[in-house]
Amino acid sequence: MDYQTIPSQGLSGEICVPGDKSISQRAVLLAAIAEGQTQVDGFLMGADNLAMVSALQQMGASIQVIEDENILVVEGVGMTGLQAPPEALDCGNSGTAIRLLSGLLAGQPFNTVLTGDSSLQRRPMKRIIDPLTLMGAKIDSTGNVPPLKIYGNPRLTGIHYQLPMASAQVKSCLLLAGLYARGKTCITEPAPSRDHTERLLKHFHYTLQKDKQSICVSGGGKLKANDISIPGDISSAAFFIVAATITPGSAIRLCRVGVNPTRLGVINLLKMMGADIEVTHYTEKNEEPTADITVRHARLKGIDIPPDQVPLTIDEFPVLLIAAAVAQGKTVLRDAAELRVKETDRIAAMVDGLQKLGIAAESLPDGVIIQGGTLEGGEVNSYDDHRIAMAFAVAGTLAKGSVRIRNCDNVKTSFPNFVELANEVGMNVKGVRGRGGF
């Protein structure tokens, strides 16, 4: 399926974006190995998260999916209750699922194969294979990409590990393995990354130690069931935040969005560029802060993106670069080589698309230089990447003509009702097949 957009006359209204994808995946995994029943409200029913649910079910976890209410009811099997799955576990398009499950499965008393779609089978896994091997795991792969064959070892040993890059997925993988290891596992990061796993471990009553740069867990503990309500995903909210910011006449409100400080890079950077964003009704529930976000149109200026904001914005850069494309002046992003190993090479995909829409964009090995200008209509390719697809749908709100975005089926992995909500606030996005359009 493709997207077809026409320019918007302005965004308005109030919407609630779906539950946070990262928190949803971690919550159901920890609930599955906890003792007792956990109800997960606000679970994101996207394809990536449902792949995680399916994998856990295949290992014996009882998970009732109430899809129309975004609720899961999980009967935890305890730390040692998982069983060998009957076949390979398919993680679909989800890098989070395969890396979290690798950590969980490294310490089990059975062997497992983890695989995924063609995109996932290109994603780098050496970053988890190496430290898990240091803990005593044995993992076979060809070229350090999926499929992964994990030979479970219930006698893992805790390690002290310095992450070569700020990566919440790698950190979380090792923390999960550390739950099953003898002794203490400590992970030190070069810069803060999202800390949902740490917050959820605390929510499920698992003791951990944390300082400014390191997090430690000791093996042998237990997780206790605890109901949880998932906040709205700020990565999904970011598309509407940018769309309202760049489109004249816009004013929207996004309700109950997760505002975890390790995820606020997109708001921090947009404010540096001159955005009019107000965060109100701040509350904290289930260890995660939540707030309403009000956004009004504003004129933006280009900036040099500070390196310390890169890990806090890593999933939002595709749509942030749309903001940069219409800002006055030049925006420079560096220290973001991680964007090249996402669902697609997001640096190359964004530069290609922006150039096709008339924007001067230059690719760097670890980033991009964008000279703000005027977005023209045209046709771009999402390269089967959900965030690229939605980012260019946002570009279509301000472009001088219609924008066609190719290959948008993967939006269902993270935001199944994106088109519905986009049109509700006035973005003018239509899903089309063949050569159809508005």
UniProtKB/Swiss-Prot annotation:
It catalyses: 3-phosphoshikimate + phosphoenolpyruvate = 5-O-(1-carboxyvinyl)-3-phosphoshikimate + phosphate. It comes from the Bacteria. Keywords: Amino-acid biosynthesis, Aromatic amino acid biosynthesis, Cytoplasm, Transferase. The active site is at D315 (proton acceptor). It holds the Pfam family EPSP_synthase. It is an enzyme of class 2 (transferase). Phosphoenolpyruvate binds at K21, G95, R123, Q169, R346, R387. Gene3D superfamilies: Enolpyruvate transferase domain. It is found in: Cytoplasm. One of its GO terms (molecular function) is 3-phosphoshikimate 1-carboxyvinyltransferase activity. GO terms for biological process: amino acid biosynthetic process; aromatic amino acid family biosynthetic process; chorismate biosynthetic process. Monomer. Catalyzes the transfer of the enolpyruvyl moiety of phosphoenolpyruvate (PEP) to the 5-hydroxyl of shikimate-3-phosphate (S3P) to produce enolpyruvyl shikimate-3-phosphate and inorganic phosphate. This is 3-phosphoshikimate 1-carboxyvinyltransferase. The gene is aroA.
